[in-house]
Amino acid sequence: SRGLGDVYKRQDRVDGAIYKISGVDPGKGMNWKQYALALLGTNAVMAFIGYLILRVQSAGLFNPNNIENMEPTLAFNTIISFMTNTNLQHYSGESGLSYLSQMLVIIFMMFVSAASGYAACVAFIRGLAGRTKNDVGNFFADLVRITTRILLPFSIVGGLLLVWQGVPQNFEGNVVVETLEGTFQVIAMGPIAALEIIKHLGTNGGGFLGAN
């Protein structure tokens, strides 16, 4: 649409700061091979970092529930799943991930995978337009603009609406309460609202809780 197309025509101070820090020239075009390599390389690096975080999460911050490290095959399956936006979960978030892992791995990859998919789609459309086969855009610029202009603004507003409606957004440990029947139930805490909003905006599933 025209509104989404305008996202790629403007640059603000936030974008400029990100480009400057990362050393990206947003005006430098890429051919399709360079674009694809940038997309794959960026996601591969992020997946590697995410895998390491999952493997050492017990030693990190924001782990009030004392979650242990994720074992190698499960960590690999998890990070590849969220990198590819398939979001296959063979764990329960409230008992298998620290809050740091939820934020730096799951939530982060939900943003990156959605933005990467959108960027690839835009580059494909540029290629079909046939202006030049040697310039389908700049992947890094597209990734930044999609994130800062579309995903983050909607996520912030939507996340605040979820918090307003009572969805937890904190770093407290899980709470054990006694029900009216006299049994005990664990109430999960954590940055749930932040994850749930990007889940609905940019992915096809993968919730904070095991019940999803």
Residue spans for each PLM region:
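Central hydrophobic cores of alpha-helical transmembrane segments in multi-pass inner-membrane proteins
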Residues: 11-23, 46-47, 116-127
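A generic, lipid-embedded transmembrane alpha helix
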Residues: 20, 38-51, 81-86
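Transmembrane alpha-helix boundary signature
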Residues: 47-64, 86-95, 123, 159, ...
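A conserved hydrophobic secondary-structure block that centers on an alpha-helix together
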Residues: 97-171
